[in-house]
Amino acid sequence: MSRFIFVTGGVVSSLGKGITSASLATLLEARGLNVTLIKMDPYINVDPGTMSPYQHGEVFVTEDGAETDLDLGHYERFIRTRLNRRNSFTTGRVYQHVLDKERRGEYLGATVQVIPHITDEIKLKIREGAGDADVAIVEIGGTAGDIESLPFLEAARQMRVELGSSQSLLVHLTLVPYIATAGEIKTKPTQHSVKELRSIGLQPDILVCRADDPIPQSAREKIALFTNVEARAVISSPDCKTIYQVPRGMHEQGLDAIVVEKFGLDLPEPDLGEWDRVVEAQLNPEHEVTVGMVGKYIELVDAYKSLNEALIHAGISNRAKVNILYLDAEDIERDGTGVLESLDAILVPGGFGDRGTEGKIAAIRYARENKVPYLGICLGMQLAVIEYARHVAGIEKAHSSELNPNTPDPVVGLITEWITEDGQKELRSADSDLGGTMRLGGQECVLEADSRAAECYGSTHIVERHRHRYEVNNNYLPQLEAAGLKIVGRSADGELVEVIEVGDHPWFVACQFHPEFTSTPRDGHGLFKGYVAAALAEQKAHKET
C-alpha cells in the first residue's frame, strides 16, 4: 500500500513546490524507495496542451503522450522513474470524467455534487497515479486560500483521515520575506497561511520556508510555536546557485529523515554522490560557450524550460558553462543577422504559428552558410528543411502549409495519418480539434549508422517524444536529397522524416522530436552533449583563426 505526501503552497505562487517535491522524491529514492509524483492543477482546461506558453510555460510531454504541466519535467529530471498521463490531471479533466459518468448513468440518478462526486474522483485519480509506488508525492497546484484549489484540498483532507498519520503527510511550502526597511524577516505570512489550511481541516506536518537567505533558528522556533509544527520540521529553503543543490540542502536539515521516521520506516542513509558531482561540475566549469536560441516566446524563459535544462546538462557533461542568449525571431526578421555573429552555436526550438518565421529561417541560413553549429527541434527542423529547399534545392516558394496554407510548394504538410504504438491508425485533417490531436509521446526512430545523430546516441534505434501535427512532405524528398540534404532518421515504418543533417557542415542536425524531454542532469542527453561539444570546437577554431 502506497504512502502519500501532499505538498501545498501558501502566501504567493511560484515558490518552487515542484522543485521541493522533486527534491524530496530524490532523497527518498536514494534511500531505496520506489517513488512517484503526481501534479494536480486547479484550472478548468482539460490539459495545458492548448494553453499559450505565456500563460503556462512549457507543455511537458510524457512517454505515453500526455501533455502536462512543466513540473513533470522537474520530476523526471530528479528521479529515475518515467511518469505517465496518470501523474498529471486538472480540474477540467476531473469534471470531464464525472460528467461522462453522469451521462452514462453511473451515479444511479443521484444529484452530482462537488462533495462527494468530484472529491471521490480526485481521490480515485490520486490512487491510480500512485500505482504500486512505495511513496506518492502529490503536489496540489495553486495557493492556500484559492477558491479553485478547494476540491483538491478537501480530497487531501479526506485521504489523510482515511490513511492515518502513519500513511500520509502534509508538507506546506511558504514564503518568509525579508523586509529591508525593518531589517528583519517576517513570519506572519507563514502563520496566516497555515491558519488558512487549518480552517479547512489540514494541519501541516512539515513546513518548507522559502527565503532569500537561510532562516535563523529563532525564527524557525517562532514559526513552529504558532503553527503547531515541530521546530525540527520547519525547514529553511534559501535561494541556491543551482536547483540541483536543493536535495543536499534539504537532506542536511533532516527533511527525509523526518519523513522516514513519521512513516515508521527503517532505511539506509541516501547516497547523494551523483548529485554532488553534478553540482560540482556545474559550479566549476572549465569552458564557456554562448548559444543563441532564436524563438518567439523569449520573454518567458519557462516556455523553454526543458530545453534550458538540457543545455545546462550538456554543459555539465562537457565541463562548460552554457550561456543562453534569447533572441526574438522578429528582431532578426527586421534587423538582420548581425546579432548572430558572436555566437558559438545557434538553436531554433519548437513552436506554433507564423510569427517570426522568416527571422528563424534567416538564422538557420546564417548557421548553415557560416558553418556555425546548429540544432533544430520540431519546428526548428521543419524550417531548416524549408530554408534548404529555398536556398539550395531551388524551390523558391517552399513553405509549410501550417504557416502558409496557400503555398504552391508545401515541403512541410499536415500529417493525415500515422500508426500509433499499439497499431491503431490515427487520422487527422485541417479541421480536427487542436486539443489532444497531435502526434504525441514516444515514437521509434531509425538512424543511419554513419550519421552524427547515431554517433551522439551511440545507437541506430532510439525512442524520442513528439508533439507535432506537421511533417516533411515526402513528395519533395528526391529533390531535397539530390541537392545534398541528408535524411538520417526516419520513423519505424520509414514514412516520416525524423532527423536531417547537412553534410558539408561541421555540425548541423535537426530533429522532429523533442530530445530535451529525456535529458537529465546526471546523464545528460547525447544530442545536446554533441551539440555543446561542437560549439566548444567552433569556439576553439574561431580563436585559432
Swiss-Prot record:
Keyword tags: ATP-binding, Glutamine amidotransferase, Ligase, Magnesium, Metal-binding, Nucleotide-binding, Pyrimidine biosynthesis
Subunit structure: Homotetramer.
EC identifiers of the protein: 6.3.4.2
Gene Ontology terms: biological process: 'de novo' CTP biosynthetic process; pyrimidine nucleobase biosynthetic process
Residue ranges of domain Glutamine amidotransferase type-1 in the record: 290-541
Pathway(s) this gene product operates in, as recorded in its UniProt entry: Pyrimidine metabolism; CTP biosynthesis via de novo pathway; CTP from UDP: step 2/2
Family membership: Belongs to the CTP synthase family.
Gene label: pyrG
Species this protein is from: Alcanivorax borkumensis (strain ATCC 700651 / DSM 11573 / NCIMB 13689 / SK2)
Binding site for Mg(2+): 71, 139
Protein name: CTP synthase
Amino-acid positions noted as binding CTP in the UniProt annotation, renumbered to this chain: 13, 146-148, 186-191, 222
GO molecular function, one term: metal ion binding
Binding residues for L-glutamine: 54, 351, 379-382, 402, 469
InterPro entries given in the database record: Class_I_gatase-like, CTP_synthase, CTP_synthase_N, GATASE, GATase1_CTP_Synthase, P-loop_NTPase
Primary role: Catalyzes the ATP-dependent amination of UTP to CTP with either L-glutamine or ammonia as the source of nitrogen. Regulates intracellular CTP levels through interactions with the four ribonucleotide triphosphates.
UniProt catalytic activity: UTP + L-glutamine + ATP + H2O = CTP + L-glutamate + ADP + phosphate + 2 H(+); L-glutamine + H2O = L-glutamate + NH4(+); UTP + NH4(+) + ATP = CTP + ADP + phosphate + 2 H(+)
Enzyme class: ligase
Cellular component GO terms held in the UniProt record: cytosol
Further remark: CTPSs have evolved a hybrid strategy for distinguishing between UTP and CTP. The overlapping regions of the product feedback inhibitory and substrate sites recognize a common feature in both compounds, the triphosphate moiety. To differentiate isosteric substrate and product pyrimidine rings, an additional pocket far from the expected kinase/ligase catalytic site, specifically recognizes the cytosine and ribose portions of the product inhibitor.
Binding site for ATP: 14-19, 71
